[in-house]
Amino acid sequence: MIDGKKVLFSGMQATGNLTLGNYLGALKNWVSLSDEYECFYSVVDMHSITVRQDPAVLRKRARNLLTLYIAAGIDPKKNCIYYQSHVSGHAELSWILSCFTYMGELNRMTQFKDKAAKHADNINAGLFTYPVLMAADILLYQADVVPVGIDQMQHLELTRNIAERFNNIYGDVFTVPEAYIGKVGAKIMSLQDPSKKMSKSDENPNGSIYLMDDPDTIMRKCKRAVTDSEGCIQYRDEQPGIKNLIDIYSACTGKTPDETVQEFQGKGYGEFKPAVGEAVISVLKPLQDEFERLSKDKAYIDSIIKENAEKASYYSTKTLRKVQRKIGFPDRIR
């Protein structure tokens, strides 16, 4: 708890370009959470280097992502928006927690198996211990809640196990986090393969709408979205492509899927797909305009980076010093 508010932690990797799915499924919902929670939103650039990165590209993407947080409406005065790499406590606590994590637990992590298969030429220790760093990210700020998707639930369970194990030995040091259960964001699927989630790492760029795509690109991708030969707009699992487009249109317009189906009753895909494109363009234009404005204000973004790193460091240091004292590290001489 900070100032009577529960603490919420979340973050995104500075790899690839954020998609419409990232925005509608997570980022858009983060904006309102500061009314209820003390929020820490990190650009988790340390996680990004488990895969080889071009240094200049990583640096640029990290800044763009932090700027996008603000452009999306996350107030940097109410929320702590920072680079993970600017707070050394993440790495320090990660090492300590790794000494309270069992190899068998990490071996069971399905994401490691998936990523190792994709990057067989670079199966590094960082990829294997990724969930421990994620646990440190969360426990460092004594987070009460963490918004997670199904693919990250296993990592949160590991975080809880590590926290409980540590607390059983040393007393109530860590808050044991819960999964955030609130408004469910739209789950947006690939435009080219609606059985897969829309992803910034999709090898087919036509499968994802990126937040910085121009209107012509957005419209082209929507018109080329994979559908079916039935020709009728119905919200059902048997038509995954159309169901996905209905979800996108509904999320962008604030309508329910049933209302969307009713609106386009009797109309074909040739009318529906451009309407989806227009809805997406309307949602993303204000975000794109604000991102462009903020990107030109280097001094402002720099000030946010500095102030928020200091705030994050303040709270992380409180936890880290407590942990260090509990496990027997010598006190610092000041």
Residue ranges and their predicted role:
Residues 114-166, 170, 190:
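Internal, conserved structured core segments that host functional sites
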Residues 45-46, 135-139, 194, 251-254:
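Short connector loops/turns at beta-strand edges and beta->alpha or beta->beta junctions
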Residues 12-14, 45-47, 144-145, 202, ...:
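Short, histidine-centered active-site or binding-site loop motifs used for metal coordination
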Residues 2-136, 279-282, 292:
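N-terminal Rossmann-like or analogous alpha/beta NTP/dinucleotide-binding catalytic cores
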